[in-house]
Amino acid sequence: MQPWRFIRITDAALRRRIHALVEQERPRTAAALGERAQEFLALKVEGILECAELLVVALGDDRDKHVFGRRTLPQMDLASVSCAIQNLWLAARAEGLGMGWVSLFEPRPLAELLGLPDGAEPVAILCLGPVPEFPDRPALELDGWATPRPLAEFVCENRWAQPQLP
């Protein structure tokens, strides 16, 4: 009952078109970042062109047919595909491969480019392959886009915002 599909991109011209869609989105995202716009634009998304494997992950068009959990939690299909991506990421890392999740794209043009059926939507572009190293901290942290926070900020006891006791 997987509501998702992994699409392996093997056509070089298609890979370039996907890269172009991401490049179209970059200035829009930069504009939304305000004072960090130029810093963001310095980040490259060349992995789409250079990675060993390029995958696009999409939610299927028939996902409403799977009713377990979706009646009360309609977002379970997104949770399911996120778990699938995370599992791939963990497996890749265990095999010594790197993976990057690109989310800078408008879903509709990418769906049209890949011939997704009505109701299906892309949720991720994944760049997978060998990497020169695995830094000891996440790239977003190393580049100053994220700051590590203690687990206690994310784990509550019995109620929201009730910090877990040590």
Show the residue positions of the predicted features.
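Solvent-exposed alpha-helices and their adjacent loops that cap or buttress functional pockets
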Residues: 1, 47-49, 116-118, 147-148
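Glycine/small-residue-rich phosphate/adenosyl-binding loop
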Residues: 1-81
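Short secondary-structure junction motifs
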Residues: 1-4, 94, 123
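Short hydrophobic/aromatic-enriched beta-strand-loop microsegments
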Residues: 29, 120-126
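Small-aliphatic-rich amphipathic alpha-helix that forms the alpha element of a beta-alpha
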Residues: 55, 63-113
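Short secondary-structure boundary segments
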Residues: 59, 104, 130
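Short, electropositive alpha-helical surface patch
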Residues: 110-122
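C-terminal helix-cap and adjacent tail motif
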Residues: 125-166
